[in-house]
Curated annotation (Swiss-Prot):
Cited Pfam families: Cyclin_N
Record's protein name: Cyclin-Q
Position of the signal peptide: none
One Gene Ontology cellular component: nucleus
Organism, as annotated: Danio rerio
Function: May be an activating cyclin for the cyclin-associated kinase CDK10.
Any GO BP: regulation of transcription by RNA polymerase II
Annotated family: Belongs to the cyclin family. Cyclin-like FAM58 subfamily.
PANTHER family named among the record's database cross-references: CYCLIN
InterPro entries: Cyclin-like_dom, Cyclin-like_sf, Cyclin-Q_first_cyclin_box, Cyclin-Q_second_cyclin_box, Cyclin/Ssn8, Cyclin_N
SMART domains recorded: CYCLIN
Keywords, ordered alphabetically: Cyclin
Molecular function as annotated in GO: cyclin-dependent protein serine/threonine kinase regulator activity
Length: 247
């Protein structure tokens, strides 16, 4: 085998290893964000604080390694920090007990012993680490408000019966919620993510909107292109493929 062929084979093998590692990392992040949303529901978190917790998690791991930091500890700290950022007070003890029950559904709540206080200290220290890693930039603009605006615009283009018989709003909101399971939520502008969630919901139910000189999505969001919509939509659909792999 020539030197060039050997080098090419080695490069392909390295790419294959990286690709396999990327898939495993994506699976881990998906599972951890599912953990955030499920524990968030049990803690009574509102949708925006839960979204903030997921964004904190994804932002942290944009520059941190899964091989160094325990993802579920980062997630617990992200939940704790998100409650502060979004002004929804969450007791540390409640977070610990709900998360403990997630992993040990048949066990009793942790007693206030050494194990509890050790975990509490770890959450607090990891929260400080997240703050430093993100340079204390922990307030984010979420796509929810944009989606509500776009829904009103689209609703005005449909007749009342067409709107009422298709769950466009519910589906778009569900897609938006699901987007936080992957890093798609931090790779794109919030208004672009909101519009694509609505675009996907309309496509799902085959709803056609009246056409004018511009497409409806050009009217409601002038700075997005069809290529960007397709890119984001592809990333969203990949999350649903990931869900099947993580069950």
């Amino acid at each position: 085998m020539s030197a060039h062929a050997s080098t090419s084979a080695a490069a392909n093998e390295a790419r294959g290893r990286r690709s396999a590692e990327d898939v495993e990392y994506s699976k881990t992040h998906f599972r951890v964000c599912r953990f955030i949303t499920e524990t968030g529901v049990k803690l009574g978190m509102r949708s925006v604080p839960m979204a903030t917790a997921c964004v904190l998690y994804h932002r942290f791991f944009q520059s941190a390694s899964l091989q160094i930091y325990e993802p579920y500890l980062v997630a617990m700290s992200a939940i704790h920090l998100a409650g502060k950022v979004e002004e929804q007070h969450l007791r540390t003890r409640d977070i610990i007990n709900v998360c403990h029950r997630y992993f040990h559904p048949d066990s009793e709540p942790l007693e206030l012993n050494g194990k509890f206080w050790e975990l509490r200290d770890s959450i607090v220290q990891c929260e400080l680490l997240i703050l430093r890693q993100l340079n204390f930039q922990v307030t984010f603009e979420h796509p929810h408000k944009y989606l509500l605006h776009y829904l009103l615009s689209v609703r005005s283009l449909l007749n009342r019966h067409a709107w009422s018989r298709t769950p466009i709003a519910e589906t778009a909101l569900a897609v938006l919620k699901d987007s936080y399971h992957g890093s798609v939520c931090v790779r794109h502008r919030p208004q672009h993510l909101a519009l694509t969630a609505l675009y996907l919901a309309l496509q799902t139910y085959g709803v056609q909107l009246p056409r004018g000189e511009l497409e409806w999505w050009q009217v409601v969001c002038a700075d997005i292109t069809k290529a960007q919509i397709e890119t984001i939509m592809s990333e969203l659909l990949q999350l649903y493929d990931m869900e099947a792999k993580c069950t």
